[in-house]
């Protein structure tokens, strides 16, 4: 699933291509892509018609287009799911086209989604913590790249929880945007085992983990995100290349680039965690 860097790459591309343009018409080719819209395809198309795209936003892994029309400020919320793509111009996989919106200049915004876990929904904006957010996103916490992210408050909350640090990093109500890949990368950078309990960690170490998450995601963002296959691409259909720079994720059996020990993998919440058994010991050495 695309994580913060990948979604932010898409948001930036959409902002560049779409802001100031008006949606002329929308065609829905697969009902699952609009399952979150109460009135389905007809309602979505009606709500989008004539709306001008005035901006873009992102909170964690959710992104949206801000709309200005006769109904006032609304948002087109996009969830990419496991394989969703927002593409401008010609598409290479028309068999996976789920939604197409034609703009007033004749260009087309396509939502392509092979696995159909993602989708579009038009919703109202609400004010939360001084920020205007789509209603379905209102419960999502700020992410480490948000300029208003309060790291001290997040550390306090983490220390008040009796939970594993990796589990906490994946809790989108505590800190958003961090998924399995970047959690493993941040924990490797901070030399912390993912099963360490947050209430037993110092404020300094928790701060280091969150700082590492932010640093890793900035690096990934600069490289266009992480693409293991062609399911994640930017709005021009191009893949990111941060997978070449991963230090932990997917490196089972390979030498740790810090100490040389073989990296390990263990099961975690129906996924996998990758870590160095030497640099990331579960029990601190005496």
Curated annotation (Swiss-Prot):
Q: Which residues form the signal peptide?
A: none
Output the Pfam families linked to this UniProt entry.
Answer: Fapy_DNA_glyco, H2TH, zf-FPG_IleRS
Extract the Gene3D superfamilies matched here. Answer: 1.10.8.50, MutM-like, N-terminal (3.20.190.10)
* Top-level taxon: Bacteria
Q: What catalytic activity does the UniProt entry give for this protein?
A: Hydrolysis of DNA containing ring-opened 7-methylguanine residues, releasing 2,6-diamino-4-hydroxy-5-(N-methyl)formamidopyrimidine; 2'-deoxyribonucleotide-(2'-deoxyribose 5'-phosphate)-2'-deoxyribonucleotide-DNA = a 3'-end 2'-deoxyribonucleotide-(2,3-dehydro-2,3-deoxyribose 5'-phosphate)-DNA + a 5'-end 5'-phospho-2'-deoxyribonucleoside-DNA + H(+)
Under InterPro entries, the record lists: DNA_glyclase/AP_lyase_DNA-bd, DNA_glyclase_Znf_dom_DNA_BS, Formamido-pyr_DNA_Glyclase, FPG_cat, MutM-like_N-ter, Ribosomal_uS13-like_H2TH, Znf_DNA_glyclase/AP_lyase, Znf_FPG/IleRS
CDD domains linked: EcFpg-like_N (cd08966)
Q: Which residues bind DNA?
A: 96, 115, 161
This enzyme's EC code(s): 3.2.2.23, 4.2.99.18
Q: Which GO terms describe its biological process?
A: base-excision repair
Q: Which cofactor does it need?
A: Zn(2+)
- Which UniProt keyword terms apply here? DNA damage, DNA repair, DNA-binding, Glycosidase, Hydrolase, Lyase, Metal-binding, Multifunctional enzyme, Zinc, Zinc-finger
- Could you give the cofactor binding note from the entry? Binds 1 zinc ion per subunit.
Please state the residue ranges covered by FPG-type zinc fingers. Answer: 247-281
Question: Which family, according to the similarity comment?
Answer: Belongs to the FPG family.
Q: Which HAMAP family match?
A: Fapy_DNA_glycosyl (MF_00103)
- What function does this protein fulfil? Involved in base excision repair of DNA damaged by oxidation or by mutagenic agents. Acts as a DNA glycosylase that recognizes and removes damaged bases. Has a preference for oxidized purines, such as 7,8-dihydro-8-oxoguanine (8-oxoG). Has AP (apurinic/apyrimidinic) lyase activity and introduces nicks in the DNA strand. Cleaves the DNA backbone by beta-delta elimination to generate a single-strand break at the site of the removed base with both 3'- and 5'-phosphates.
Q: How does it assemble?
A: Monomer.
Would you tell me the protein name for this molecule?
Formamidopyrimidine-DNA glycosylase
Species for this entry? Mycobacteroides abscessus (strain ATCC 19977 / DSM 44196 / CCUG 20993 / CIP 104536 / JCM 13569 / NCTC 13031 / TMC 1543 / L948) (Mycobacterium abscessus)
Which classification does the entry list for the species? Bacteria, Bacillati, Actinomycetota, Actinomycetes, Mycobacteriales
Which gene name does the record give? Answer: mutM
């Amino acid at each position: 699933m695309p994580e913060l860097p990948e979604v932010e790459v898409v948001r930036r591309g959409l902002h560049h291509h779409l802001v100031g343009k008006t949606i002329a018409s929308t065609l829905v080719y697969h009902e699952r892509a609009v399952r979150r819209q109460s009135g389905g395809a007809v309602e979505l198309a009606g709500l989008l018609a004539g709306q001008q795209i005035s901006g873009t936003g992102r909170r964690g892994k959710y992104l949206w287009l801000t709309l200005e029309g006769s109904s006032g400020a609304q948002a087109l919320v996009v969830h990419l799911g496991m394989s969703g793509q927002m593409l401008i111009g010609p598409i290479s996989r028309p068999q996976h086209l789920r939604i197409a919106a034609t703009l007033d200049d004749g260009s087309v915004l396509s939502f392509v989604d092979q696995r159909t876990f993602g989708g579009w929904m038009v919703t109202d904006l609400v004010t939360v913590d001084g920020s205007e957010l789509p209603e379905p996103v209102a419960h999502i916490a700020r992410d480490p790249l948000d300029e208003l992210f309060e790291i001290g408050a997040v550390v306090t909350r983490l220390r008040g929880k009796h939970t594993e640090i990796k589990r906490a990093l994946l809790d989108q109500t505590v800190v958003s945007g961090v998924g399995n890949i970047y959690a493993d990368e941040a924990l490797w950078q901070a030399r912390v085992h993912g099963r360490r309990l947050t209430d037993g960690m110092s404020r300094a170490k928790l701060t280091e983990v969150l700082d590492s998450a932010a640093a890793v995601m900035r690096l990934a963002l600069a490289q266009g995100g992480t693409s293991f296959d062609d399911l994640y691409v930017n709005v021009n259909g191009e893949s990111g290349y941060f997978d070449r720079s991963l230090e932990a994720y997917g490196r089972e059996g390979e030498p740790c680039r810090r100490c040389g020990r073989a990296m390990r993998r263990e099961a975690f919440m129906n996924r996998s965690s990758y870590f160095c058994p030497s640099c990331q010991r579960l029990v601190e050495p005496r």
